Amino acid sequence: MSTRLEKAILSALIYADIFDYPLTIKEIGKYLIQFKIQSASWRTKFKITAKDLEFIKYKNSFYYLIGRENIIKTRREREQWSVEKIKKADKISHILKFIPTVRLIGITGALAVNNSKEEDDIDLLIITKRGLLWTTRFLMSNLAKFGIK
């Protein structure tokens, strides 16, 4: 492996592989490590480069490391579980947004990239107005006691 692009592609795929997450070509472009895409023709360069790299395989719109084809199925299963969890997180956030001290509610963790396992919980990032963290926590805790979980 000699070019910077090849190293960047491999780095992105290795990192994603840690999470059993094959990447689409668009995601590879998004997650390239230490490489800036400077032209619209990078996808063509990528396809040529990927064909030359013996340790990268392609199937069903996904790129993955050799011997890891099974992670395509894993990703699809986790995407389905994530859809349900996002629906639940959306319902929760619609309620929590009425707490006047809440500035932002965001989804974090594996769910943020649609890679949530069936047994994973929903991780939310809550940003509050300055100086009102504990007030917000108190209000949210009380909401949780009354069935909002």
PLM regions and their residue ranges:
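Aromatic/basic-lined ligand-recognition segments
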Residues: 137
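Helical scaffold of the NTase/Pol beta-like nucleotidyltransferase catalytic core
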Residues: 1-106
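Glycine-rich loops and low-complexity Gly/Arg-rich segments
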Residues: 88-90, 129-133, 148-149
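Short amphipathic alpha-helical patches
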Residues: 32-36, 119, 148
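Conserved catalytic core of two-metal-ion nucleotidyltransferases
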Residues: 140-149
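Catalytic metal-binding acidic patch
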Residues: 109, 113-134
